[in-house]
Amino acid sequence: MTKRETVERRLSEVPPGVIRPYTQTELKSVFSTLKDIGKAEPAVAALLAGESPLKDFIAAAFTLSPYLRDMAAADEGLLTLAISKPLEPLLTDLVRDARDCWKPAEDAVPVENEVMSRLRIAKRRLSFVAALADLARIFTARDTTRWLSEMADASLSAAIDHLLLSAHESGKLKLKNLAAPSEGSGLIVLGMGKLGARELNYSSDIDAVVFFEPSAGIIDDPYDATENFGRMMRRLVRIMQERTADGYVFRTDLRLRPDPGSTPLAIPVEAALLYYEGRGQNWERAAYIKARPVAGDIKAGENFLRELTPFIFRKYLDYAAIADIHSIKRQIHAHKGHGAIAVKGHNVKLGRGGIREIEFFAQTQQLIAGGRMPPLRVRATEDALAALTEAKWIDAETRDSLTEAYWFLREVEHRIQMVRDEQTHVLPDTEAELKRIAFMLGFEDTKAFSEKLEEVLRLVERRYSALFEQETKLSGEAGNLVFTGQKDDPDTLKTLSTLGFQRPEDISRVIRTWHNGRYRATQSVEARERLTELTPDLLRAFGESKRADEALLRFDNFLSGLPAGIQLFSLLGNNPALLSLLVTIMSSAPRLAEIIAARPHVFDGMLDPALMSDVPTRDYLAHRMGNFLSNARHYEDILDRLRIFAAEQRFLIGVRLLTGAIRGEVAARAFTHLADLVIEAALNAVLSEMEAAHGPYPGGRVAVMGMGKLGSFELTAGSDVDLILLYDYDDTAQESTGAKPLDVVRYFTRVTQRLIAALSAPTAEGVLYEVDMRLRPSGNKGPVATRISAFEKYQREEAWTWEHMALSRARLICGDASLMEDARSIIASILSQKRDVAKVSTDVLDMRSLIEQEKPPENNWDFKLINGGLIDLEFIAQYLALIGPVKGLGAHEPGRNTAEALQALAAPVMESQAFDDCMAAMGLYTEISQIVRLCIDGAFNPKEAPAGLIDLVCRAGDCPDIPTLEGEVKRLSKAVRKAFVAVVKNGG
């Protein structure tokens, strides 16, 4: 007990102004809630009747945390409890309530639902009180984590005692002491991670592993013991995490046990020790640094950890393990380089400079030296930093700065989770929600908070990065299934059929091919061993997909092109999510499957564990591209690196879309950001080459304008890019100034031709983009490069209506800043002209009619060309952009996608239902088109598409099946066509 805790602390001690209310509107709503609570709770009514820092604090806290507010409203006595009693005695009572809830009352063993209810009530109340004490700065983050950990210990212990007593009562085992069921039971529950270190975060799940000692003798038959304890653990998970009317206790994860894919939930001690001795990995050593017996037979748990000590802390200085420890870090944390750290959306646990880096800073050094230095064998991160200082491994300044950073980040983490009781470590990505976190931490505004956080993150990143200088392969464990000999094993064929394969003989033959070492990826003994271990999980995963045979054969095609396999097989065995993702690609996205079969390197990006949480923004992609190009040696090297980077990032954006991590509109924007960056890098490389060969052109300026889907941020995975290259120069110059000068036309024509070649020439590394320049002035008849003055003259004097429609989607994407600004001004001027509405209407209708005649849709799923499809929606937006100056619809804004243009231009002129239908259609077409273009080449036909793609399309359309989705497409397309006619035919 600390000195501070000898004095009873109360919430009424809260300092004035420790936090600020979120908004005045929220504050009014909170006071209304508090008044309702006060009707039944005199203490709350009395609080409201007066003026006090406590009243202001409670109101502010409830505006900042909807979760706390809802808890107080649902359990009206809860707030009275929190404001009326000393904090430590109250929390001690709640922990005791949880710990004792299993005990028989009047000789009757409580039923499981009663135990569950009492645990949930105690946990909920402790969470509420601890959060308020933390927000009030009466508790430190240390206090909060300790109380949460004590509640977790008590809850697990009570649940285990209840389960043991229940099993005793039903005759499944025989306890030694009914008053203390766990005592002498041999059932070991180890708390791992933050639970083991007594460092639980506010909405933490808990990691535990369960072992049992058969020699304890409470179950005679060891086979019965495995089955009974396994069943007991399933009930334990239910008791702890099932959501009921009373909430939940803790989300509980038992997957840190040995080989979780193939072992029971409770493992015999001897089997566990054999596993760790023979097959234990460095990540498991790191995990066991924090392990602590938290429930069950504590003495047996301590004995188990003593026996495991030589595995965790080796006697020699274990530098050899560091590369493998780094591989663990790679699994949890995405390398983000040294650019600016964006506070919004940052993961304070796993991101750069986050909590995990501090933990690994300590744990890595504990693993290196803990065998020789027993004082380093401590669980808590703060204690570990202190021990490392005592051992002279780090200096006092490092200890103090990292300790301070650790607890600050834990406070931030707690605030993130207190808002809505979500197990997240990611800061909000909006200013409004970030303000909530800043206020909860006592900052004046988000700027002050962001500056402090970035300072802390950079400090941690700096300290941590020095520890790791190399990476090695990851290792993995899985089950085993061996295919030997030349003949099929009958039992194996039955298993394959049971797993879901229609042609088990073919699948058996394919797998024997793998194990015979006929592919480069399976030529080494180690690779085949890893693949053998992986095979059961692999077959199970593919068997669960629709058309399992087809999907596995695509995987075989992928495998045949791999240069090596050990790392991949290890990763797939270690990472079920990665295996699931690979199966999804093989079963639903033939186009992606072909890409990774042809270019396996694109698969590397899937190993990034932050892949699904990192949104591929322009900054995100630019940072990665900068790193990837940084060591390029020459022009061709730059282009090859661009091709590799673009292929990988297109693939990774597609993977995010495929898994639902991002929506279609986000994918479109990401594909476009990628194209922008690649085109800019290619242009810069081309200009450097031109200047090296022919010198700069006096006054020369070049800019690239994106048209079509590139201009409107609507690219898909398979889109080409529509470009116009603009240039300008000094009129007095006759030629460029290099050793091989060129006249102006040849110079800028060659720049354009080189850019087109850089982007679209097929090479060993593939093609960047197919380039279409038909939207330049005079189309294919005109020069490939256009001087800015000629561009303006053409647009003002010669351009057709359809060319001005296309101009409404134009966007300057790279090049000389002043020329880009000149072009923007010209476009804005042209689009601000007042046109003859009737003529524009006639031209648009004629053009739509011509497209219908010359390019009829392939089927009802050809969303671009069907009546009421994407062209109709785009034409509505473009038509309104042209007549907008006459109708007063607002100025043109470059870079708007079609949905944004409709929102700005169509909403004021359309009936609300028609507008809603158009927006719904736009969303539906976008989602499905993005998925289809990602997964297959050519048109989508439900009768021929892979079964997995059918599921994805239905998911994208938010419909249960294809007939329902087809009906929705017909309804919306009909509404869009009606709106198109109403808007365009009637002149807006």
Curated annotation (Swiss-Prot):
For the region Adenylyl transferase, what residue ranges are annotated? Answer: 476-988
Q: Kindly indicate whether the keyword Nucleotidyltransferase belongs to this entry.
A: yes
Concerning InterPro entries, the annotation shows: GlnE, GlnE_rpt_dom, NT_sf, PII_UdlTrfase/GS_AdlTrfase
Among the GO biological process terms of this entry, one is: regulation of glutamine family amino acid metabolic process
Which CDD domains does the record match to this protein? NT_GlnE_GlnD_like
Recall the GO molecular function terms of this protein's record.
Answer: [glutamate-ammonia-ligase] adenylyltransferase activity; [glutamine synthetase]-adenylyl-L-tyrosine phosphorylase activity; ATP binding; magnesium ion binding
* UniProt keyword list: ATP-binding, Magnesium, Multifunctional enzyme, Nucleotide-binding, Nucleotidyltransferase, Transferase
Q: Which GO terms describe its cellular component?
A: cytosol
Per its Swiss-Prot or TrEMBL entry, what cofactor is needed? Mg(2+)
Region feature (Adenylyl removase): 1-472
UniProt cross-references to PANTHER family, sorted A to Z: BIFUNCTIONAL GLUTAMINE SYNTHETASE ADENYLYLTRANSFERASE_ADENYLYL-REMOVING ENZYME (PTHR30621:SF0), GLUTAMINE SYNTHETASE ADENYLYLTRANSFERASE (PTHR30621)
Q: Can you name this protein?
A: Bifunctional glutamine synthetase adenylyltransferase/adenylyl-removing enzyme
Its taxonomic placement starts with: Bacteria, Pseudomonadati, Pseudomonadota, Alphaproteobacteria, Hyphomicrobiales
